Curated annotation (Swiss-Prot):
It is an enzyme of class 6 (ligase). Subunit of the heterotrimeric GatCAB amidotransferase (AdT) complex, composed of A, B and C subunits. It comes from the Eukaryota. The keyword DNA damage does not apply. This is Glutamyl-tRNA(Gln) amidotransferase subunit A, chloroplastic/mitochondrial. GO terms for biological process: glutaminyl-tRNAGln biosynthesis via transamidation; mitochondrial translation. GO terms for molecular function: ATP binding; glutaminyl-tRNA synthase (glutamine-hydrolyzing) activity; hydrolase activity, acting on carbon-nitrogen (but not peptide) bonds, in linear amides. Allows the formation of correctly charged Gln-tRNA(Gln) through the transamidation of misacylated Glu-tRNA(Gln) in chloroplasts and mitochondria. The reaction takes place in the presence of glutamine and ATP through an activated gamma-phospho-Glu-tRNA(Gln). Keywords: ATP-binding, Chloroplast, Ligase, Mitochondrion, Nucleotide-binding, Plastid, Protein biosynthesis. It catalyses: L-glutamyl-tRNA(Gln) + L-glutamine + ATP + H2O = L-glutaminyl-tRNA(Gln) + L-glutamate + ADP + phosphate + H(+). Belongs to the amidase family. GatA subfamily. HAMAP family: GatA. Its EC number is 6.3.5.7.
């Protein structure tokens, strides 16, 4: 039961000391980089679908059937989805009927979209991969989902995740463990592992995830897809089950930068149901996605790119470091001006993040008491009902983070933990502001290693937490960031993907998308297809 657990021993390691990446946490990949020059640049699934529908080459129903068939073939191995919608073919048929009538189609018409299970979908299970919400079916759509549907998008199903977004491997799901399409013995990352793996396995065209400390970007790196975390406030959080409200954002996955960018455009904008959503204008991101034929010899001439020094120091796998350096060289060849930048407070970000996120989660998850929210376990006394409902409803990782947060917020430790963590957050924001005043974007690895084995770090939470060191600072600063594949390292049947993280100034996703699209379309080997799909139509 939750009330009988003691504060975890790891709390003694949480004071805001500088965090060094341990060399022992990196074991997935070797230093050799694999040549992928035989692979051609990727094509946008959204644009291809639209062209096929408008030309009459295919129908929305035929497209939907092909994706549902692929789900049936690959899902027993991957376990990306917790629920597949029964309305996919019906929704596709409605799009075909609109085409037959000559009606105008929305930009996402016929696009099959996976939705992370902590994002509410009307009438469909939305459990946050937790037993405490096992049978919950929301009576409303999250704003992001509502916008997708209004533009013709089809929700294909709800994707697996770490319970309430608390984890980096998707092993903390209460229902199943998702496998990485590149190597079924490895994790897809987390907490949005199901959304990333589903896009990588072409079970859906694009998907929604949530990113509190890297939960879109790290699995994008592990699965070889594009993961886009918008600026805090760019996308409404209405209908997103809260983990850490000052950090949570809804993000996008796609097999290309264009797909992720067009999905972001669809869900962005002010929402009166979310007071933290911004009234900033949403640019026409689609203008960035030109054909490769239009690129000049140096299409990024003069773009200033800062390489974050601290992200390439000891503790980063040598293969990841090499892939990042090669990606930087490619940017330079495209005309970028490279400089090395330092974020002095970088190493403080990880402990500060876990104090803040755990503190906010202990407050947010207090609503799940078996009375107001969540499955109820009957007991003779009210306190016992709370204890039993939460004790049986929450998994171990969630309980540990609730305890960490409650401990950090307690009267005797508030100043030592939570207050200091917020002070560090201010320093991190200042570091990024200074770096981005001198550079258009910053780059770093997305994670210290490629995907590791399922179960490898399950019993060592500190090692797992350390893997978030590349991503958490961006959430603390509220900035946009995108991860896209930049190479393969040895491991698995045909190599393991690693991602390059690009970080931009607040509300400047447009620049990230421009640089990322040109990088992707001109990089040899940028079409990353996992071996699982070799024999799947």
């Amino acid at each position: 039961m939750l009330s009988t657990l003691q504060p975890p021993r790891s709390l003694s390691l949480l004071p805001l000391r500088r965090f060094q990446i341990s060399k022992t946490i990196v074991s997935a990949a070797s230093s050799k980089t694999i040549d992928t020059s035989v692979i051609s640049p990727p094509q946008s699934q959204i644009l291809t679908t639209r062209r096929s529908l408008l030309s009459g080459e295919t129908t929305a129903v035929e497209i939907a059937k092909s994706y549902l068939s692929r789900i049936r073939l690959t899902e027993p191995q991957l376990k990306c989805f917790l629920h597949v919608s029964e309305n996919v073919l019906k929704d596709a048929q409605e799009i075909d009927q609109r085409i037959a009538k000559g009606e105008e189609l929305g930009p996402l018409a016929g696009v099959l979209i996976g939705v992370k299970d902590n994002i509410c979908t009307q009438g469909m299970p939305s459990t946050a991969a937790s037993r405490i919400l096992e049978h919950y079916r929301p009576p409303f759509d999250a704003t992001a989902v509502k916008k997708i549907k209004e533009l013709g998008g089809i929700v294909v199903g709800k994707t697996n995740m770490d319970e309430f977004g608390m984890g980096s491997t998707t092993e903390a799901s209460a229902f199943q463990v998702t496998a990485n399409p590149w190597d079924l013995s490895r994790v897809p990352g987390g907490s949005s592992g199901g959304s990333a793996a589903a896009v990588a396995a072409r079970q859906c065209m694009v998907s929604l995830g949530s990113d509190t400390g890297g939960s879109v970007r790290q699995p994008a790196s592990f699965c070889g897809v594009v993961g886009l975390k918008p600026t805090y406030g760019r996308v409404s959080r209405f209908g997103l089950m809260a983990y850490a409200s000052s950090l949570d954002v809804i993000g996008c996955f796609g097999s290309t930068v264009a797909d992720a960018g067009m999905l972001l455009h669809a869900i962005s904008g002010y929402d009166r149901f979310d007071s933290t959503s911004s009234k900033q204008d949403v640019p026409e991101f689609q203008s960035q996605f030109l054909s490769v034929d239009h690129f000049e010899s140096k299409p990024l001439n003069g773009v200033k790119v800062g390489i974050i020094r601290e992200t390439l120091e000891d503790g980063v796998d040598s293969g990841v470091r090499s892939a990042t350096q090669e990606a930087a060289s490619h940017l330079e060849a495209l005309g970028c001006i490279l400089t090395e930048v330092s974020l002095p407070s970088f190493s403080l970000g990880l402990p500060a993040y876990y104090v803040i996120a755990s503190s906010e989660s202990s407050s947010n998850l207090s609503r799940y008491d078996g009375v107001r929210y969540g499955n109820q376990v009957m007991a003779e006394e009210l306190n016992k009902l709370y204890e039993c409902s939460r004790g049986e409803g929450f998994g171990g990782e969630v309980k540990m983070r609730i305890l960490m947060g409650t401990y950090a917020l307690s009267a005797g430790y508030y100043d030592a933990y939570y207050k200091r963590a917020q002070q560090v957050r201010t320093l991190i924001r200042k570091d990024f502001k200074a770096a981005l005043e001198q550079n258009d974007i910053l780059i770093s690895p997305a994670a210290p290693s490629a995907a590791y084995k399922i179960g490898e770090k399950k019993d060592d939470p500190l090692a797992m937490y350390a893997g978030d060191i590349m991503t958490v600072n961006v959430n603390l600063a509220g900035l946009p960031a995108m991860v896209l594949p930049c190479g393969l390292v040895e491991g698995g049947p045909s190599g393991l993907p690693v991602g390059l993280q690009m970080i931009g100034a607040a509300f400047d996703e447009e620049k990230l998308l421009k640089v990322g699209h040109i990088f992707e379309q001109t990089l040899k080997g940028s079409s990353f297809v996992p071996p699982l799909l070799a024999n799947v139509a």
